[in-house]
UniProtKB/Swiss-Prot annotation:
Catalytic activity: uroporphyrinogen III + 4 H(+) = coproporphyrinogen III + 4 CO2
Protein name: Uroporphyrinogen decarboxylase
Compartments (UniProt record): Cytoplasm
Pfam families in UniProt: URO-D
Lineage: Bacteria, Pseudomonadati, Campylobacterota, Epsilonproteobacteria, Campylobacterales
Gene: hemE
């Protein structure tokens, strides 16, 4: 698989590409599948439809990897927090974590309840071409914890950060509990058939450097170390969004580092490029305009050259991006990097 070879810095015939949120609302096929499911959460839980949605971008765009269609919040959901998705607002937990007692009341072994995810993986792997990789994923302990404490997305993360500074032992108990679940969750994804795993630390930038390293990065290192110990042949990709200023403190046992669009690739390459393959980082809104898209691709390829790079966006696809431009991006990257 070209994608897996690239994760391990092996020679590839061209630079592989996939896109975060490549299965999404910009595809009419996705809209139809979601309509059939009835809701976003039901789509995640319906393995047949989730498989359909996982495969769509590979078939339509020609990307080199599929990423499992699911949501990071299925883990806290199965740990006992009731979850709803409110239209135009996003996820909302009906109960939140407020103290040690509420951390202790969370169910252990939630990963055993996620058979709908593992079924989606095995179905997708059966239908996916042998040349294409399937990526599994989860959210980072810190990012999941913010949703569980705030109850929803947040601009300030005030409740989470208040807990971090005033009751760090409570937050650490939650992060530890989540880490143990996530190690087993990703292990079962691997056993079900994914070829690589990715951990999204979407709210990494909410923390100052020292707090980030202690309350997020340390847990990412713990998870990736255990996964590499168990499955050395499976690439681990970490994507901590918005920590470009902290790159000099990044270390650990993983293979690929996801660079967001706010971090110049030349900076990431200088600091991390010898240790890790880099993944990213086209500004997603460049896909609105072909000229802007071409300019962005040129800039990235000039910095990254032929090895140590997987092409991706620096964040997720937006719902109204023109699909023809997404397809063009894949063709352009393949053509420009063919060696």
């Amino acid at each position: 698989m070209i994608f897996i070879d690239a994760c391990f810095r092996k020679e590839t015939p061209y630079t592989p590409i996939w896109m975060m949120r490549q299965a999404g609302r910009y595809l009419s096929e996705y809209q139809e599948s979601r309509k059939k499911a009835g809701s976003f959460l039901e789509l995640c839980k319906n393995s047949d439809l989730a498989t359909e949605v996982t495969l769509q971008p590979v078939e339509i765009l020609g990307v080199d990897a599929a990423i499992l269609f699911s949501d990071i919040l299925v883990v806290p959901l199965e740990m006992g927090l009731n979850l709803e998705f409110i239209p135009k607002k996003g996820p909302h937990f009906l109960e939140t974590i407020t103290d040690l007692k509420s951390v202790e009341s969370l169910k252990v072994g939630a990963y055993k309840q996620l058979n709908y995810v593992y079924d989606t993986i095995s179905q997708t792997r059966q239908k996916l071409s042998k040349e294409k990789a399937l990526i599994g994923f989860c959210g980072s302990p810190w990012t999941l914890a913010t949703y569980m404490i705030e109850g929803e997305g947040s601009k300030s993360y005030a409740k989470s950060k208040k807990m971090l500074y005033s009751e760090p032992e409570v937050l650490k108990a939650l992060l530890e509990k989540l880490s143990l679940e996530l190690i087993e969750y990703l292990s079962l994804q691997i056993q079900a058939g994914v070829n690589a795993v990715m951990i999204f630390d979407s709210w990494a930038s909410a923390l100052e450097k020292e707090a980030y390293l202690e309350f997020s990065w340390d847990y990412l290192k713990k998870i990736s170390k255990e996964l590499k110990k168990r499955y050395a042949h499976i690439p681990v990709i970490l994507f901590p969004k918005g920590i470009g200023a902290y790159l000099d403190s990044i270390d650990g046992e993983f293979d690929v580092f996801g660079v967001d669009w706010g971090t110049p690739l030349e900076v990431a390459k200088k600091i991390l490029g010898d240790k890790y393959v880099l993944h990213g980082n086209l500004e997603p809104t460049r896909l609105y305009d072909k000229n802007a898209l071409e300019e962005g691709v040129e800039k990235i390829l000039k910095v990254m050259g032929n090895q140590g790079h997987i092409f991706n966006l620096g964040h997720g696809m937006l719902p109204d991006l023109p699909r023809e431009n997404a397809k063009y991006l894949v063709q352009l990257v393949h053509a420009k990097t063919r060696r």
